[in-house]
From Swiss-Prot:
This is Ras-related protein Rab-25. Its EC number is 3.6.5.2. A motif (Switch 1) lies at residues 35-49. One of its GO terms (cellular component) is pseudopodium membrane. The lineage of its organism: Eukaryota, Metazoa, Chordata, Craniata, Vertebrata. Belongs to the small GTPase superfamily. Rab family. It comes from Oryctolagus cuniculus (Rabbit). Expression is restricted to epithelial cells. Expressed in the gastrointestinal mucosa, (highest expression seen in the ileum and colon), kidney, and lung. A very minor and variable level of expression is seen in the splenic tissue. The gene is RAB25. A lipid is attached at residues 209-210 (S-geranylgeranyl cysteine). CDD domains: Rab11_like.
Amino acid sequence: MGNGKEEDYNFVFKVVLIGESGVGKTNLLSRFTRNEFSHDSRTTIGVEFSTRTVLLGTAAVKAQIWDTAGLERYRAITSAYYRGAVGALLVFDLTKHQTYAVVERWLKELYDHAEATIVVMLVGNKSDLSQAREVPTEEARMFAENNGLLFLETSALDSTNVELAFETVLKEIFAKVSKQIQNSPRSNAIALGSAQAGQEPGPGQKRACCINL
């Protein structure tokens, strides 16, 4: 999967990051979108997102990745955060079992606010800290399989599987969209979710319409 031109895209996919504070969501976001990692552990406040345009086959896909940015500490994430999302990475810290123990609650909250067809990946982050592991790989994988989720272990610190995690989610979304396009006379320039539907494309951009998974 390669980088496309930021100003030219065929699809916009909103993907949300969810999970407990301190599991590494912000660093996964910055590693994927900017190839950066911050050792500063201070929690960021306020919802923010970053984008990266990638190529899936011949299609340019603009991934709009949203980060809770600390709001999960106060249980203050609103339905607006989930609105229009077609993908989600549910992240836990594999060195802190308590962050894994609440994964089911996060999944329920996600399904309460997002479309049932949303593509979800369970992500065990901080795989570089293998000596401090508290969550067995097989336990998390089994939970993912039983709940119809994708699963990967990642390290935002050393980049392990970060690209693969986002790439896999985006490909799954793209496969669903492509299947719908085959059965639809609509334009092939499609944005998913109400948040993107109202955006006006800039110079060189392809106008997008809206489709639900």
